[in-house]
UniProtKB/Swiss-Prot annotation:
Name assigned to this protein: 3-isopropylmalate dehydratase small subunit
Gene Ontology terms: cellular component: 3-isopropylmalate dehydratase complex
Enzyme Commission number(s): 4.2.1.33
Phosphoprotein as UniProt keyword: no
Top-level EC class: lyase
Gene Ontology biological process terms, A to Z: L-leucine biosynthetic process
Oligomeric form and interacting partners: Heterodimer of LeuC and LeuD.
Gene transcribed to yield this protein: leuD
């Protein structure tokens, strides 16, 4: 998993509350268990004018020019600004996969659905909770300033606006450690690989009848 330390990026404003996981990545694209291939279908029903299907050539599909991610000023955005209860609905890890592959490193909102919130950390995305007032002000500034960027410093737990104002956020210490060091569940397990090997050797020696090749 890619580590998250500090990031500066263009902000894309998704001014909708209660965005659910089926809107983030529609159900017809969930047939794959690979972590790649979902970026082109992020927010598929909003980005395109037709009905998306797996494995089609998205470059030939008609775009919804009114959708925020299709606006020229938000091309290359890596910070998503959203409203409350982002990521609600059914549990699907494909949602953070799609956001990550599109290029987003962080999502800022007043609140998140619990399962999506947890899945984001496990996949290298940083969900940041700010107050309604802070989020409202960010929406206003993004709208008024093309190319608006934020700098996110995970170690300092701070979001810095272009005008220099710093917005602080809270994060669980363990989740912070994992993101700073790029550790997903597998990475955490591999940190104890020596202890695991020692246990397996001891277990094999003490109960050899459990192993066919013993």
């Amino acid at each position: 998993m890619k580590a998250f330390t500090q990031h500066t990026g263009i902000v894309a404003p998704l001014d909708r509350a209660n965005v659910d996981t089926d809107q983030i990545i529609p159900k017809q694209f969930l047939k794959s268990i690979k972590r790649t291939g979902f970026g082109p279908n992020l927010f598929d029903e909003w980005r395109y004018l037709d009905v998306g299907q797996p494995y089609q050539d998205n470059s030939k599909r008609p775009l919804n020019e009114e959708f925020v991610l299709n606006h020229a000023r938000y091309q290359g955005a890596s910070v998503l600004l959203a409203r409350e209860n982002f990521g609600c609905g059914s549990s699907r890890e494909h949602a953070p996969w799609a956001l990550d592959e599109y290029g987003f490193r962080s999502i800022i909102a007043p609140s998140f659905a619990d399962i999506f919130f947890n899945n984001s950390f496990k996949n290298g995305l940083l969900p940041i909770i700010l107050s309604d007032e802070e989020v409202d002000e960010l929406f206003k500034q993004v709208e008024a300033n093309p190319g608006y960027q934020l700098t996110i410093d995970l170690q300092a737990q701070a979001v810095t606006r272009p005008d220099g104002k710093v917005l602080h956020f809270e994060i669980d210490a363990f989740r912070k450690h994992c993101l700073l060091n790029g550790l997903d569940d597998i990475g955490l397990t591999l940190q104890d690989s020596d202890a695991i090997k020692a246990f397996e050797a001891k277990h094999r020696a003490s109960q050899p009848w459990l192993f066919r090749d013993a």
